[in-house]
Amino acid sequence: MLLRKSIPYIKICRDISASVRNNKEIAQKLPLSVPLPMENNSKSIEKGCPPMGRNSRVTRLPNGLKVCTEDTYGDFVTVGVAIESGCRYENGFPFGISRIVEKLAYNSSESFSSRDEVFAKLEENSGIVDCQSTRDTMMYAASCHRDGVDSVIHVLSDTIWKPIFDEQSLEQAKLTVSYENQDLPNRIEAIEILLTDWIHQAAFQNNTIGYPKFGNNSMDKIRVSDVYGFLSRAHTPQRMVVGGVGVGHDEFVSIISRHFDLNKSTWTTQPTVLPAKIPEIDESRAQYTGGELRLDTDLTKLTIGKPYPLLSHVVLGLEGCSYKDEDFVAFCVLQSLLGGGGAFSAGGPGKGMYARMYTELMNRHHWIYSAIAHNHSYSDSGVFTVTASSPPENINDALILLVHQILQLQQGVEPTELARARTQLRSHLMMNLEVRPVLFEDMVRQVLGHGDRKQPEEYAEKIEKVTNSDIIRVTERLLASKPSLVGYGDIKKLKDLRSLDQAVAKRDLKYLFN
């Protein structure tokens, strides 16, 4: 049977080989700019036809849990759970509790007495697992062989709904988080992580997205009962999406229905593990405030024994939009247009080198070590940032250049530059989704945020429709907000927030000059 099915493909391969042999002499004489004289018998897909290989399905279980899948080829799959959790929901709980939950993942549970047992079960199915918390999402994910989906889902459901914590495991998690908090400032490659955390604190002061993810000092207050209390509020079916890439939908739904039963969760079967009073999850809308966070620090220790100059860092933030906003795609194109990165770009020329942060900042000012734009979007708000690193004596000049980059966008952009930014963004989107774990994360995040799965072709079409007037409109939207400012390192020469606010409000750089 298998042989009969393969005969047509063998014939096709033979025809291709014969065509190549017949045209070999011609091909050797033709320049690379001339197409080979070979017939292409493949039929193009008509416009409006459903894209090949897109078979996403979403099912909502009676308990409110959403299950989504997208089948793919191959022997290995990626499965996992996305939860509306993270530091933005820590109001009322000790700050840092979401990172403690992250470190406690895949420890002992009702079915597994130790972490060793968990990983022994994973090894049986060639499985690897991970748990990562962001500002608004907790992600438990695993990759394994197709035959091991049921066993791996068992591991995931146990670590999410049936964990067993004790004082020893909690203390170990606290030590791990404390070490990371102390280690991050000592690693030059971690500066971007810290700057991102700080600009959120400055932009959304003391609320939701602005709660700190790193460097908090309240972990000593966290008790075992607090962890269970947080899980009982955040790990509810209505706040969760279970996803699988490379699995059959109906069978996967059946597996999830067996393993994800809230009535069997640790805090339901053993209510004594909960504290006497559990705060409600903070569902308030993010409030962009604007603000300033200055960390005047000696960073000389980061350069000792390393080929890095002594740098200071500045971040300018302006109010962006949520991923549900009509301007979300336009903001993404704007970020692609500005682009940026470090002075050395691994991978060689062509990797974003035509973006403005390269052409107008790093290529013209040798003292700028890095410059990059980011668009951080959440369910209800966002912050658009531009970051630069330079020697301390040039840090205010770097801020002036960043503001200038935003101000000049009011004049619009050239058609070729905009087309390049759109093409690069589409390419980035499509190429990333070729990686199975990335496809999984994209799928579960969309179902978690939108309730359904939007295909990348939909976004590609929206990207292509972004015009010059859209760029001008979202630029004006940025400039209408109060700025946020973060300075890190030797920032004595960096202007204050009041001067920056005047420069943005009056569209005039003179307020930033000494």
UniProtKB/Swiss-Prot annotation:
Effect of a null allele: RNAi-mediated knockdown causes 63 percent embryonic lethality. Embryonic lethality is further increased in simultaneous RNAi-mediated knockdown of mppa-1 and mppb-1 or ucr-1 and mppa-1.
Entry keyword set: Mitochondrion, Transit peptide
Pfam families linked to this entry: Peptidase_M16, Peptidase_M16_C
Boundaries of the annotated transit peptide in chain numbering: 1-55
Any single GO BP term: proteolysis
Signal peptide positions (record): none
Gene Ontology MF term list: metal ion binding
InterPro entries noted in UniProt: Metalloenz_LuxS/M16, MPP/UQCRC_Complex, Pept_M16_N, Peptidase_M16_C
Principal location listed in the UniProt entry: mitochondrion
Subcellular location: Mitochondrion matrix
GO cellular component: mitochondrial processing peptidase complex; mitochondrion
Disulfide partners: none
UniProt superkingdom: Eukaryota
Subunit structure: Heterodimer of mppa-1 (alpha) and mppb-1 (beta) subunits, forming the mitochondrial processing protease (MPP) in which mppa-1 is involved in substrate recognition and binding and mppb-1 is the catalytic subunit.
Family: Belongs to the peptidase M16 family.
Function: Substrate recognition and binding subunit of the essential mitochondrial processing protease (MPP), which cleaves the mitochondrial sequence off newly imported precursors proteins.
The protein's name: Mitochondrial-processing peptidase subunit alpha
Species name: Caenorhabditis elegans
Classification of source organism: Eukaryota, Metazoa, Ecdysozoa, Nematoda, Chromadorea
Gene name of the encoded protein: mppa-1
